[in-house]
């Protein structure tokens, strides 16, 4: 699978003003940090520190962040860890909120209704979410 390398950090729709740096280039303190699990662990080893938020990036067809990995990121950075799903071109598909009860998706979600949850999220935000059970594969229709 060929993935587009990100040149700029992701802007989370629920935190658009949060300054986020790419884990691959961060070597010191920053407000927010984004990257794959591997990039984030390397960044922590290189001295990167996030003060507010970690955005763990995922791509379709790759394993979703496990609870063990989420706990490891929490231990490394001591800030909330939210999952963000990108397509192979690096475009935002779905994103986790602080309730961590599924991934919120936009109106152009590439998934069928059988994997989307329409009930309100615990965070109070409206809209469809990718069901937690469906996050294991994360493959659009």
Q: What do the predicted segments below correspond to?
A:
Residues 1-141:
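Active-site glycine/GP-rich loop and adjacent strand/helix microenvironment
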């Amino acid at each position: 699978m060929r993935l587009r390398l990100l040149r700029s950090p992701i802007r989370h729709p629920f935190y658009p003003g949060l300054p986020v740096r790419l884990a691959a280039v961060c070597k010191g303190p920053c407000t927010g940090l984004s990257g794959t699990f591997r990039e984030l662990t390397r960044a922590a080893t290189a001295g990167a520190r996030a003060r507010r938020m970690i955005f763990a990036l995922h791509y379709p067809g790759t394993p979703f962040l496990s609870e063990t990995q989420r706990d490891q990121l929490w231990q490394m950075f001591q800030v909330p860890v939210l999952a963000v799903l990108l397509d192979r071109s690096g475009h935002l598909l779905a994103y986790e909120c602080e309730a961590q009860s599924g991934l919120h998706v936009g109106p152009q979600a590439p998934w069928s209704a059988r994997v989307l949850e329409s009930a309100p999220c615990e965070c109070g935000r409206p809209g469809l979410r990718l069901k937690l059970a469906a996050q294991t594969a994360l493959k659009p229709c």
